[in-house]
Curated annotation (Swiss-Prot):
Residues 413-432 are annotated as: Disordered. The lineage of its organism: Bacteria, Pseudomonadati, Pseudomonadota, Gammaproteobacteria, Enterobacterales. Disruption phenotype: Deletion of dncV incrementally, but significantly, enhances swimming and swarming motility compared to the ECOR31 wild-type. It also enhances biofilm formation on abiotic surfaces after 48 hours of development. This is Cyclic GMP-AMP synthase. The gene is dncV. Residues 423-432 have a biased composition (Polar residues). Belongs to the CD-NTase family. A01 subfamily. It comes from Escherichia coli.
């Protein structure tokens, strides 16, 4: 008989969603790890600022700067990196040094933890990912771009390398767009991309927070950001948000993570609350099929949004909605998946004419998902249906009683989501 999988997907105790969502305890633990990184980063910048103050007040020599840095967390850098950092602080122009002394780093979490689509890992070796950007004012490098670029990289690396040295099982990795600290015991890594924003916009943020007496508290800053006044006060022009790069000729890339965050939040409002759950399910399918690799989370999310924007569907019928997505997903990826951030220069997934072996393998695996869901629906027993659908999402759900006989098809379907009228996106950056 036809089986219905709505409870399989949505039951809050035994269903797939319950196996994917982090508990409050798990979420709080990740926030605590994030806070450790933030506090260390803040401390490292404070140490560097104090040395910069001493250079201005005491007319230190380069050797004196180097010796002072040796007594800080900078000691965890390599000798070459320590020498570079000492030189950068020593050679700062007066205006750049004054601004460096004045401003503190601010933090903004991006990615799945911020979107509320972060799943528990499935295969051994898979990790939860927190992206937590560090932001500093652009005037540090207005006169000489290389100063601000290298300074940010070295100071954030100092933070992560010092944590690596002090915590067993914490491992630093250098990435092109971020520093990463892997925390194996918690199956987690924290990425710290480094951004620069214009001094003027940074000052507006700081003034708004000061006036609300919020500047001292990470948690209060985040609460402030959630209300309308806070978000407006923290607006930043997206073309002024610069991401530091380690590799290649370009030192900076215009990149505002809030573009994608705002796009996804608007998509959830437009399509419905089921969008977040469906994105979680597709990421769970990806994690079950590939121990490493597979389509990126943002490419899956974008493809799902594209499909549900176009196609009539009943958001409360997860069985039907997941079949709809599974049927159309290969075609969506063969067309190519463009980023919702129009500043991205490359597609999230190339069109079929540009596929290599890796891309073709991904689409072939996608093509199998629809068949699995149909076979599960037509299984002879609940137990067989459970075994079959778990081929797609992994053996997370074990209660076959969640699978029920299929009810009549719903009489009313949601119309495809209309394309929203063109309007400026509220692109913000918040300190955490």
């Amino acid at each position: 008989m036809p089986w219905d999988f709505n409870n399989y997907y949505s039951h809050n105790m035994d269903g797939l969603i319950s196996k994917l969502k982090l508990s409050k305890t798990e979420s709080d633990k990740l926030k605590a790890l994030r806070q450790i990184v933030r506090e260390r980063t803040r401390d490292v910048f404070q140490e560097a600022r104090q040395v910069a103050i001493d250079v201005r007040r005491q007319a230190l020599t380069l050797e004196s700067v180097r010796l002072k840095l040796e007594k800080t967390n900078v000691r965890y850098l390599s000798p070459e990196e320590r020498a570079d950092l000492a030189r950068l602080i020593f050679e700062m122009e007066d205006e750049a040094r004054d601004d460096f002394i004045k401003f503190q780093p601010r933090f903004w979490t991006q990615g799945s933890f911020q979107y509320d689509t972060l799943n528990r890992p499935f295969h051994p070796g898979q990790e939860m990912d927190i992206d937590d950007g560090t932001y500093m004012p652009m005037t540090v490098f207005e006169s000489e771009p290389s100063i601000g670029h290298t300074l940010l990289l070295l100071l954030v690396d100092t933070s992560l390398k010092s944590l690596e040295a002090e915590n067993d099982g914490w491992v630093f990795e250098e990435k092109n767009t971020c520093g990463r600290i892997k925390i194996y015991r918690e199956k987690t890594h924290i990425d710290v991309p480094m951004y620069a924003i214009p001094k003027e916009q940074f000052q507006k943020k700081q003034t708004a927070a000061d006036s609300a007496h919020l500047i001292k508290s990470d948690s209060v800053f985040e609460s402030f950001a959630l209300n309308r006044g806070g978000r407006e006060a923290y607006a930043v022009e997206s073309d002024k948000v610069n991401l530091a790069l380690r590799e290649g000729v370009r030192r900076w890339s215009v990149s505002d993570p809030k573009i994608v965050e705002d796009w996804f939040n608007e998509s959830c409002k437009r399509i419905g609350g089921h969008l977040r759950s469906v994105c979680r399910f597709m990421k769970a399918w990806r994690d079950a099929q590939w121990e490493v690799g597979g389509p990126s989370s943002i490419s899956l999310m974008t493809a799902v949004v594209n499909i549900l924007d176009r196609e009539s569907h009943n958001g409360s019928d997860l069985t039907g909605t997941m079949k709809l997505i599974a049927r159309l997903l290969p075609e969506e990826f063969n067309r190519g998946v463009e980023s919702p951030d129009d500043t991205d220069e490359k597609p999230l997934f190339p069109a079929e004419s540009n596929h290599n072996v890796h891309h073709r393998a991904i689409v072939e695996t996608m093509e199998g998902l629809y068949g699995i869901l149909l076979a599960a629906e037509q299984s002879e027993s609940r137990e067989e249906a459970l075994r079959k659908i778990n081929e797609a999402f992994g053996k997370r759900v074990t209660n076959a009683l969640l699978i029920t006989s299929s009810a009549a098809a719903p009489a009313f379907l949601n119309a495809p989501s209309k394309e929203p009228s063109s309007k400026p996106i509220n692109k913000t950056m918040v300190s955490g």
